[in-house]
Amino acid sequence: MLYNKEQGTSGASSSGRRTKFHFDRFVQMVLFIAANPNYCCSVASIPKSGVTPDLKRADILEQKIKSLNSALSPKLKEESRLGGPLHNPSILPAPSFSSLPISSNGKKSLAGYRPKSRKKQTILPNGQPKECATCGDTWTSQWRSGPNGNVELCSRCGIAYRKKMEKKIRSQQSSDDGTKNFIFKNK
């Protein structure tokens, strides 16, 4: 079990909900395939190549699903009792090609895929979430240093502050260069 020190046990999402979502999605896909016999070819339409389909794999898959449900059941009950996930919900596996949506022509598509947000909430020792000094946002992918040198700005405000400071420095340097050139030209 992983534990996120920054989030504690008050995570916004639950692994149980994610697991249920994926299981429900799997069931919907199976029901869709069962209801649409033309969606994929039947075993009878496969040309005889001397290889018979391995029906034992379907039985093995069914056993794996049953064992997964029985293994997850106690964990999901404990999560619902505690009111939060027992692992770090911000650490998610990378999407595989098999998890991508299926387009109307039956091929995998990247069109509907959006990567998960990497924003997280930092909890201070007093139990309060850390807030951005500029906008007050508590969720960010990275905390950045601000005008006081402390790490007090969210990523968006920190980048804006850095760009503003870089622009100010560039304008000072260009005005300094212009003054020096003007002085040297007069001599």
From Swiss-Prot:
The alphabetized UniProt keywords are: Cell wall biogenesis/degradation, Metal-binding, Zinc, Zinc-finger
One Pfam family hit = GATA
Q: Which Gene3D superfamilies match?
A: Erythroid Transcription Factor GATA-1, subunit A
Q: Mind telling me what this protein is named? A: Protein ECM23
Task performed by this protein: Involved in morphogenesis. May be involved in cell wall organization and biogenesis.
Q: Which parts of this protein are zinc fingers (GATA-type)?
A: 126-180
Q: Region Disordered: list its residue ranges.
A: 106-127, 167-187
Which gene does this sequence derive from?
ECM23
Q: What induces it?
A: Expression is regulated by the KAR4 transcription factor and reduced after pheromone induction.
Q: Name one GO biological process term.
A: cell wall organization
- Which species is listed as the source? Saccharomyces cerevisiae (strain ATCC 204508 / S288c) (Baker's yeast)
Recorded hits in InterPro entries, A to Z, give: Znf_GATA, Znf_NHR/GATA
Q: Which GO terms describe its molecular function?
A: sequence-specific DNA binding; zinc ion binding
SMART domains registered for this protein in UniProt: ZnF_GATA
